[in-house]
């Protein structure tokens, strides 16, 4: 009878996944610091990236080095932001955000993934209109729904969504009010379990059969690319299955 993965093998896989997450966060910290300066109190994007790093158990020393490299105090790599758009099989719209030090490599890798999985890249704006850019502050079950809602609306949030199945809460904001709402909620004693500025599809598309397999394969391939930070799609996640 065959043996399952060894403890060492599982640990190596876990370490590799953690390393990839750290790499993406460090790139986000670098770009945020270079664009808006190294002081998180005056740079909401940097503050958000730092919080993401700390919540992923990244050390403060690693974060500080990334900031110093970005601001020129230490030698470092310069990354640029690039966005690609396209379609997966079944007409599923996909947005791919990259932070890369080699634009030629990034576009080649993204194009290869689309092609290999039966999709195709589009031009700028070809699918972006199907998504809304917004801030999302997520609170786990157990948060005081009324208190969070009141504090969020007073701080300028656009909407508060409560999920009846588990009691989780999402506070939705415009991108330019995300930082102030997040700070106001923190001051009121409410720290989100997760906070980000993201894209959400206006309408989801359900897929099945071979199409679902190919869509899932494409999204996984894109997520695994070193230059890719985030992948957004309008696929109904439930239709992709396990």
Curated annotation (Swiss-Prot):
A single BP term in Gene Ontology: regulation of DNA-templated transcription
Statement: the UniProt record of this protein carries the keyword Ribonucleoprotein: no
SUPFAM superfamilies membership: YebC-like
Pfam families assigned to the protein according to its UniProt record, in alphabetical order: TACO1_YebC_N, Transcrip_reg
Cellular component GO terms, alphabetical: cytosol
Protein location: Cytoplasm
Similarity comment: Belongs to the TACO1 family.
PANTHER family referenced in this protein's UniProt entry, alphabetically: TRANSCRIPTIONAL REGULATORY PROTEIN YEBC-RELATED, TRANSLATIONAL ACTIVATOR OF CYTOCHROME C OXIDASE 1
NCBIfam families in alphabetical order: PRK00110.1, PRK12378.1, YebC/PmpR family DNA-binding transcriptional regulator
Protein name: Probable transcriptional regulatory protein XCC3027
Protein species of origin: Xanthomonas campestris pv. campestris (strain ATCC 33913 / DSM 3586 / NCPPB 528 / LMG 568 / P 25)
């Amino acid at each position: 009878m065959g043996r399952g993965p060894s403890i060492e093998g599982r640990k190596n896989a876990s370490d590799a996944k953690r390393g990839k997450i750290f790499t993406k966060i460090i790139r986000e910290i670098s770009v945020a610091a270079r664009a808006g300066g190294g002081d998180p109190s005056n740079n909401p994007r940097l503050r958000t990236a730092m919080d993401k790093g700390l919540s992923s158990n990244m050390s403060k020393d690693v974060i500080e080095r990334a900031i110093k490299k970005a601001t020129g105090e230490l030698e470092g790599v310069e990354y640029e932001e690039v966005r690609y758009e396209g379609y997966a099989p079944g007409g599923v719209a996909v947005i791919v955000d990259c932070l890369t030090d080699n634009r030629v490599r990034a576009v080649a890798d993204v194009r290869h993934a689309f092609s290999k999985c039966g999709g195709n890249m589009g031009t700028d704006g070809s699918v972006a209109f199907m998504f809304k850019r917004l801030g999302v502050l997520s609170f786990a079950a157990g948060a005081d729904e009324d208190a969070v809602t009141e504090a969020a609306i007073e701080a300028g949030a656009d909407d508060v969504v409560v999920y009846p199945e588990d009691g989780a809460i999402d506070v939705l904001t415009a991108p330019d009010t995300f930082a102030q709402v997040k700070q106001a909620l923190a001051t009121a004693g409410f720290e989100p379990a997760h906070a980000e500025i993201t894209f959400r599809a206006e309408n989801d598309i359900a897929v099945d059969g071979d199409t679902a397999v190919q869509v899932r394969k494409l999204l996984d391939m894109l997520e695994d690319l070193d230059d890719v930070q985030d992948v957004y799609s309008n696929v109904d996640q439930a239709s992709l299955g396990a």
